[in-house]
């Protein structure tokens, strides 16, 4: 049996194939609930002030995550709505260009006090959690993506998410219902402005996104899918209850 995370990754094979999407752990440091005081303490340690709406992208500094495009979109949106930008992440061990991209992003930011560029270690899970929970809008402007589970991590925090319509991100976001899908810098800028200007709509997107993740991308669903797959392999399907 072969397991694929999405239909587009499946192949024509002579053995059975199953689709099992990845999932997030809601009890992990990256996703568990945090107190308001704890969030504020972490923001203070990172040098981020909560006096302005926060637009955030959490991703490694990789051209395919388009951090420069996020910066450009934020600058366009800021002409209409006052806000700050957080670009937080790190480099991947298999991406030697990460340091180059990080340097390029810092140069483009030009010491703007409203831009916070954080090169975080791989263990900074609580910090990422706090940043996301303090954010007003979260972006995942990928130009190319696999499943993109960082989108589900953001949706789990009940935040409105603007993401590139690539890879399996559309499985996680239904446009204008559980998030926003975009294709360009200008489109991203438009939706940043719209969501910051329409908090009730932004809140409804966040609530719908949270429910979508709760129903489809948590560990419990992941375990259920594998148990059903194991039952299929044993050949005894008389006691299988499909939920």
What function would you assign to each model-found segment?
Residues 1-43:
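A short, active-site helix/loop in glycosyltransferases that binds the activated sugar's phosphate group
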Residues 129, 152-156, 167-171, 177:
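Short alpha-helical segment that forms part of, or immediately flanks, the ligand-binding pocket
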Residues 160-163, 173:
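Short hydrophobic beta-strand element within catalytic cores of glycosyltransferases
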Residues 194, 201-216, 222-228, 232:
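A short, well-ordered alpha-helix in the C-terminal region of glycosyltransferases
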Residues 89-93, 97-130:
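Nucleotide-activated donor-binding/catalytic signature segment of Leloir-type glycosyltransferases, i.e.
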Residues 43-65, 71, 85-86:
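Conserved donor-binding/catalytic core segment of Leloir-type glycosyltransferases
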Residues 175-186, 194-199:
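Conserved acidic donor-binding segment of nucleotide-sugar-dependent glycosyltransferases
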Residues 143:
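Aromatic "clamp/platform" in nucleotide-sugar-dependent glycosyltransferases that forms part
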